[in-house]
Regions:
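Short beta-strand-loop/turn "lid" adjacent to the catalytic site in phosphate-handling enzymes
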Residues: 64-102, 130-134, 161, 165-186, ...
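Pocket-flanking alpha-helical
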Residues: 86-88, 109-113, 246-248
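Active-site core segments that coordinate phosphate-bearing ligands/cofactors
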Residues: 5-6, 115-128, 138-173, 183-201, ...
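Conserved small-residue
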Residues: 16-18, 23, 76, 104, ...
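A conserved helix-loop-beta module that forms one wall/lid of the active-site cleft
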Residues: 201-214
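Short alpha-helix plus adjacent loop in nuclease-associated cores
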Residues: 100-117, 447-448
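N-terminal glycine/serine-rich phosphate-binding loop of ATP-dependent small-molecule kinases
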Residues: 1-97, 125, 153, 222-226, ...
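A generic structural motif
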Residues: 32, 101-102, 299
């Protein structure tokens, strides 16, 4: 029997899973890590300690705990947080801390500079959307303007999955799904490096080779085998972003399917059979050939509940440390006792700026409507509903503005542990949402892609047969009517206060 390994590196934690050739989970493991926040608006990782360190730790743990002979692992799949950037030397040693995705706003001056230089129309044409803090080209420009020696020394500018793949087998690659984040440095039709556009940002030779996520990029080197506990010669996939792998893990394979990932941030992928043009979102190719993804993302989801836990539920955190119930379960229980609508309390969840559809790194969080009768439970409920409103705004753009049918919405990520949150999303959107049978996340998507590439399945359709739905949440339409009646307040809170938010920065 062959086994397949999948490892995903996330914002605050990394996960790994080992499956057999029928996609049954044999063993899983996880580990946490810190995200550095050295300055306001800066979020970064030590790529060596966090990305590579977590990968090695998890691969070794999975092999040892499972009792599987590493030689039986037929293929390795990997993913990691996307839209990040680390400069490396020829041996794939990181030359500086990795700048993370859209939550890191340090490249805003470069974005403003590019918008001024190109003009908004040309900028949208080049980037495929309004340039934002999730784009990697402005991050490369930040290195050029703020760390010129590092920029000059860099052999490549990589995203996290590319970094891991290079560590494992010594080849610098990036999959098409993540190459979109590097636009305009690649020609999006040929996926060759665009030397003319690179001139503004970096040398053409500093860009990785574009391949498909499910291509076998190479095999594990002896050096990597010693670090990971795997066997030299084991095939390694090119890898992809965590969001794409997570969508795969839920069975989001076909046009009309939509994934809502509730992690530290929220991320959305809607699959279409054609390219869709919308400058507010991130349209592009998807992992599966012949499909296109409308991608989008917010800057806060679980990060907001984490903040509430830390600031308003310190007693529950302390009790948890002494053997009491999990603090998040206490928060969920409290929120369940508050009626939909949180007794008139609304939350704009823009606590780290906002990505789509606002594309405003200077947006700020708001609790609106507070009165003396409100409690911390109301604030938790309002925060969950605030994130649900952001989900609904993306559903509306896809269905109402673009006229694209959404067949099903699959929820995935840590937020699926909170039934109140899932119900709020169903109620605000006014439609059913489902949870996959396997909710391990992106690492499971990595493993099943490894199984496909390794020959355990002949096609995506065959692979889909072994994946299923565990739960479907039906909307309460009375609650939906209440949320719909307040939707304009949620929307106008931002538009009316945007300029004031910017004055605070």
């Amino acid at each position: 029997m062959a086994f397949y390994l999948g490892i995903d590196i996330g914002t605050s934690a990394s996960k790994g899973v080992l499956i057999d050739d029928r996609c049954n989970i044999v063993c899983q493991a996880s580990c946490g890590h810190e995200t550095d926040n050295p300055r306001d608006g800066w979020y970064q990782h030590d790529a060596e300690a966090v990305w590579w360190g977590d990968f090695c730790r998890l691969s070794r743990e999975l092999v040892v705990r499972s009792g599987v002979n590493a030689a039986q692992i037929g293929c390795v799949g990997l993913s990691a947080l996307g839209c990040d950037c680390v400069p490396v030397d020829t041996e794939c040693n990181a030359l500086a801390p990795a700048i993370l995705y859209g939550v890191d706003a340090r490249s805003k001056p470069q974005i403003d500079e590019l918008l001024s230089e190109y003009g908004p129309d040309r900028a949208r044409e080049l980037f495929g959307h309004d340039p934002c803090s999730s784009d990697i080209a402005p991050k490369i420009l930040w290195f050029k303007e703020n760390m010129p020696e590092v920029h000059e020394r860099a052999a490549k500018f990589l995203t996290a999955s590319s970094f891991l793949c290079a560590k494992l087998m010594g080849r610098f690659t990036v999959d098409r799904y993540l190459a979109e984040d590097f636009l305009p440095l690649y020609d999006r039709y040929t996926w060759k490096v665009d030397a003319r556009e690179c001139d503004r940002f970096c040398r053409p030779d500093q860009m990785a080779e574009v391949m498909s996520a499910t291509d076998i990029a190479g095999v594990i080197t002896q050096r990597a085998a010693e670090a990971t506990g795997l066997v030299a010669g084991t095939p390694v996939l090119v890898g992809t972003g965590d969001s794409g792998a997570e969508a795969i893990s839920t069975g989001v394979f076909r046009p009309g399917d939509m994934m809502v990932q509730l992690g530290s941030t929220a991320y959305f992928i809607y699959l279409a059979d054609h390219m869709v043009d919308d400058a507010r979102l991130w349209p592009g190719t998807f992992i599966i050939p012949g499909t296109y993804g409308i991608c989008a993302g917010t800057n806060t989801a679980g990060a907001l509940t984490s903040w509430l836990r830390q600031e308003l539920y310190r007693d529950a955190v302390e009790a948890e440390g002494h053997g009491g119930p999990d603090a998040y379960s206490v928060m969920a229980h409290d929120a369940a006792d508050v009626a939909p609508g949180a007794d008139g309390l609304l939350c704009l969840p823009y606590f780290a700026g906002e990505r789509t559809p606002l594309n405003d790194p200077e947006a700020r969080g708001v609790f609106f409507g507070l009165t003396g009768r409100h409690t911390r439970a109301h604030m938790v409920r309002a925060a969950l509903e605030g994130v649900a409103y952001t989900v609904a705004s993306h559903v509306d753009i896809i269905e109402r503005e673009h006229g694209l049918p959404i067949g099903r919405i699959m929820l995935v990520g840590g937020g699926t542990k909170n039934p109140i949150w899932m119900q709020a999303i169903a109620d605000v959107c006014g439609r059913e949402v489902s949870v996959a049978k396997v909710t391990v996340g992106a690492c499971f998507g990595d493993a099943i892609m490894a199984a496909l590439a390794g020959g355990a399945y002949a096609s995506w359709d065959e692979l889909a047969q072994v994946l299923g739905v565990a739960q479907t949440i039906v909307p309460d339409m009375t609650a939906h009517e209440l949320y719909a009646s307040r939707r304009h307040i949620f929307d106008e809170l931002y538009t009316r206060n945007r300029d004031l938010m910017h004055e605070l920065v």
